[in-house]
Amino acid sequence: IFGGTVGVSLLALYQQGDGLRAQNYQLILFESAALFFFFLIFQKWKRPFLLLVPALVCLVLINHAANGKAGNLVQKEDYQEITDSAWQDAVRDALDGETGLCRTEQSGVAKKRKDNVNRIWNMRQWTTSVYSSAYDTEYQNFRNNVFQVEQPFRNGLMQSASANPLFQKFMGVKYVIGRSEDGENFTTEVQETAAPVIYGTSQILSEKTYQTMEFPYNQTMLMQYAVTDEENIAEHGVTKTKGIQETNVTFTAKHGVTKEDDSWKIRTKKNQKSTLSLDEDTSGKERILYLQFDVENEHPNRDVSIVINGIRNKLTAKSHLYYNGNTTFTYVMKLSADQKKVNVTLGKGTYRICNLKSYVSDTTVLEDDSLYQSTFTPDWNATKGNQISGSIEMEQDGYLITSIPYDSHLEIKVDGREVVTEKVNTAFVGCRMVSGEHWVTITYHAPGLSAGKWISLAGILLWAGMWLLTRKFSRAEKNL
């Protein structure tokens, strides 16, 4: 046991390499040596407490060092804030008057988003976040590689609510619930032009054309068109998002930032406050800043994180079990009128920021809702469990578009007849629809559900049969 513990500890220490983890594994080595010492004493005195007491002491010390001291334990005040039932009241109040299908999320910094990644307060609260080993690969790929939302956490499977206003609009996040600055009251930000979760449109773009769109058009074009794999689409009227202009930005800090040609070299032993300056004339109106760059980590076994305007991106150490592979950091944010500087926190480490792309535009792309020509109206009496039902009036032939991740077990019926489902917007379920008024039902058939029910029934019958046979044999033995 001692040899195995030491071997694993040394291997982990070699692979991790950074200071905090090195201290933790040194503690494990010390624990192993101490336990081995008391084991030798036990061999002579044969007193159980010689093994039990040192083991308990080591467990407490290691837990304090690895969790408590590192800040991994949830504080009582934080837990009370996270689970405060007042959040439930705020979400309910926001959804009480809502008749459509939309999403509702909680705002906050990365830590708050992490706390609420799988949390809902109401059965009608739909979110964009998920943290599960049984994740949808299409949706995961869309977030990370197609739309390229920020990735604030070490674990690549932890997909939290995004601060990207374009992603929020695309996914139908209509309500964002938060706390006021004094922390006393709740605030509800209503995004009236957010996409319906289900809608009809004839503004179609082929996936082949969409795949040629580079940042930031890979995001903005999804506000103007629905993407399908139909190749025979007349795209002569398709135009790129207007009003997006390239701009120059500069990172400045007191220490640790060096400009090198078209890149910035970061070398800092602790988090460094910095400023991102925009080289442009402000319009006196709100704007959107689109920012993307690659991160070259010179110490790949250490994490790198950069926070810009409260939005965090993190590149995990390659040795991490759930390495996120986030080598391209993307930020999309709204700027207030006349704002030319953005606060930045450069995480500790040695790395290079390169291949930087920066653009600005007005907020028209957020305000335009012409894509959503026909809105789906849910029937809340028929919408429950694994089924969504409602009506839609298509103004012209086109597609039924949803922001429900595509799955082969999803079934769509239009006017009672099953139709062929298609993958739309590269990762979501949809289908073709003709003009007119229709009744739509979307049903999810869980794979293995029927087989599971039959197996459970067979198990119950077998158990009942065994119970009856046992009683019969018991009575027969008593009669002998």
Task: Pin down the residues of each PLM region.
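Hydrophobic, well-ordered secondary-structure elements that form the walls
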Residues: 1, 104, 124, 176, ...
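Extracytoplasmic/lumenal acceptor-recognition loop(s) of multi-pass membrane glycoenzymes
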Residues: 56-79, 93-167, 195, 201-221, ...
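Catalytic cores of secreted or luminal carbohydrate-active enzymes
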Residues: 167-175, 180-259, 352-368
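Structural motif
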Residues: 106-110, 178-181, 293-294
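Active-site-proximal, structured, solvent-exposed surfaces of multi-pass membrane proteins
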Residues: 245-480
